[in-house]
Amino acid sequence: YKIRRGKLNHIFISHLHGDHYFGLIGLISSMALLNREQPLHLFAPPGLEEIIALQLKVASTTLPYELVFHPLNKEEVILDTPKFSVETFHTQHRIPCWGFLIKEKKLPRKLDKEKAINLNIPAAFYSSLKMGYDYTAKDGSVVYNKQVTLPNSPAKSYVYCADTIYDERLINIAKN
């Protein structure tokens, strides 16, 4: 996916079968060798912290950055950023297993800069226009947001659910 390791700040593990986390210790160690400094957040079922701690201990490895473990215990929003959110849901597997619904937040409107300039709207108000606000000039005249902006692309979402049997409930989670 061509994501630079330095930009990877959150990792989501669905369950504790080896094919879903065995490569994690290698990634964590590689990040240490590359002098990572910012914390790495791991969202996983309880137990992963002990597994990683044992692997680091046996290898006599001290990380130059913090591992922050977030145990998955219930269906909830586990991460909420200005750009996206992540929520968990149970899936049907032999051991506790989680799916993840990643939802992009509503994108700001697109500004037609040429129209804004022609209507003498100062650049300082452009971000407000993108957020949906109208502009009121000093003389009291109003330029409505829709006069100088266009809707952005609809927000996207992505559902990750691995190693699960057929479950009607997942259809509703994955809709839209």
Task: Tell where the protein language model's regions lie, with residue ranges.
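Active-site-proximal loop/helix segment associated with metal-binding centers of metalloenzymes
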Residues: 82-173
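Conserved acidic residues
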Residues: 9, 83, 176
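Active-site metal-binding motif and surrounding structural segment of the metallo-beta-lactamase
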Residues: 1-43, 71
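Hydrophobic packing residues within well-ordered alpha-helices of enzyme cores
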Residues: 24-27, 52-55, 170
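Short loop/edge segments at beta-strand edges and connector loops
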Residues: 71-73, 162
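Non-catalytic surface loops within mature trypsin-like serine protease
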Residues: 46, 73-74, 104-106
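Local beta-strand/beta-hairpin segments that build beta-sheet-rich folds
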Residues: 75-80
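Active-site neighborhood of divalent metal-dependent phosphoester bond hydrolases
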Residues: 36-71
